[in-house]
Amino acid sequence: MGSCCSSQDGDGNGKATAGSTVDSHELSQSVKGKIKQPEPKPKPPPQVPPAQDVKYPIYVGKYDYDSRTDDDLSFKKGDLMYIISTDEGDWWFARSKDTAGKEGYIPSNYVAEYKSLDAEEWFFGQVKRVDAEKQLMMPFNNLGSFLIRDSDTTPGDFSLSVRDIDRVRHYRIKKLENGTYFVTRRLTFQSIQELVAYYTQQADGLCVNLKGPCMVMEKPQTAGLSKQANEEWEIEKKQIKLLRGLGAGQFGEVWEGLWNGTTSVAVKTLKPGTMSIEEFLEEASIMKQLRHPKLIQLYAVCTKEEPIYIVTELMKHGSLLEYLRGDGRSLKLPDLVDMCSQVASGMSYLEQQNYIHRDLAARNILVGEHKICKVADFGLARVIDEEIYEAKLGAKFPIKWTAPEAAMYSRFTIKSDVWSFGIVLYEVITYGRFPYPGMTNAQVLEQIQQSYRMPRPMGCPEKLYAIMMDCWREDPASRPTFETLSWQLEEFFTTGDDAGYKDMER
């Protein structure tokens, strides 16, 4: 498939089941939904929003959100809101706590329960150590920037990650049976917030005192463009304005667009006759449920008339292939390995969902700000008309990226995706070089059957080449899982499970 483009993104859930509440009059037990009248007073009560008469949980904005439709509620990071209803799942109905009392739908992953741990700027939840290091080492974070995350190994415990001068230090935060927390046993705290407040004032054994929360690289993606678009994701073409072409693939064009006059999106327009609309909608309904920070979010489709529109998030730098051949030429090995680990993370999620990509290649991986990579076009190859695919590519699929069992017998599995990932590793480490240079598709297929594998590219570490070769094992069952590939690449430059941790227990 040709490359599709998408925007920034990320991942904080901010979900909770209970919230802080507002003191109010009791609900009438006899008439549901009506409010008990207050006792008569000499003076009339002040005018307040109706929501304050009911005990609704209070949530706080974790990110800025600008309304996309008339049904949405805009808010800023730190704004307080009453959550009126959570029945809509990913989109909650809320009322602003300010005197205006505006109402509307909000993305549930943009808010957190007021005064909860999730509401703290420095709490990142389920973030891996390597991701914490990556974020803290970004140029916009400084000495003493920090975050607290869930422990990688011990449920209920936490880890404190702090930016030192040129590296990140990690400290284990443990919980005692009495519910207190500590970094060192000589000093315990009633809450994580108290611990942070203490170490903000003095280092007391840390590499530096805590200066400020780690700044996030991207906001999380919302579930769909809006509440309505999430439920009825077939949208009208008149809602989309195509702004500028971003490129053309085998089966259509990619555009930067604007949805509803408010939201930047990427639009893939498919050439008429490319696929059966019925089969596409069946596959797209599955694709829309696949959500992961390293997968491109499918927002909506337009299938009432051709060309079909596929609407997704917009990524600033386009395909990984073009990025590597252009602005990415200056990337060093750690950046290249990190980008590969991001792809493996997204594919590991597909693996867990028993979903097969079928066309994994650098052209189908997109790049955003801060070298964020996301897998795109997963599943589309399955619904492309076979005759058209053959006419465009000279084969039913791109041979040089395809595992031999898939190329010869159409045996597509997650293990054939692993083979393709090995080719992606080659593309990345060579800054976008075409695989099997100088060989035709027929020659490649013949040579692979005779156990030929591409030699180690210049500048490629032996350790990385060994991972490539594992991906290209003849027996699909012998190839690694994407889960294994993900941690191998994440830990590529570390030594030992406890690397980077400082033990302050004493």
UniProtKB/Swiss-Prot annotation:
Residues 1-10, 18-31 have a biased composition (Polar residues). Residues 122-214 form the SH2 domain. It is found in: Cytoplasm. It catalyses: L-tyrosyl-[protein] + ATP = O-phospho-L-tyrosyl-[protein] + ADP + H(+). The active site is at D359. GO terms for cellular component: cytoplasm. Keywords: ATP-binding, Cytoplasm, Kinase, Nucleotide-binding, Phosphoprotein, SH2 domain, SH3 domain, Transferase, Tyrosine-protein kinase. InterPro entries: Kinase-like_dom_sf, Non-receptor_tyrosine_kinases, Prot_kinase_dom, Protein_kinase_ATP_BS, Ser-Thr/Tyr_kinase_cat_dom, SH2, SH2_dom_sf, SH3-like_dom_sf. One of its GO terms (molecular function) is ATP binding. Residues 54-116 form the SH3 domain. Its main location: cytoplasm. ATP binds at L246, G247, A248, G249, Q250, F251, G252, E253, V254, K268. Pfam families: PK_Tyr_Ser-Thr (PF07714), SH2 (PF00017), SH3_1 (PF00018). Residues 240-493 form the Protein kinase domain. Its EC number is 2.7.10.2. CDD domains: SH2_Src_family, SH3_Src_like. Residues 1-53 are annotated as: Disordered. Belongs to the protein kinase superfamily. Tyr protein kinase family. This is Tyrosine-protein kinase isoform SRK4.
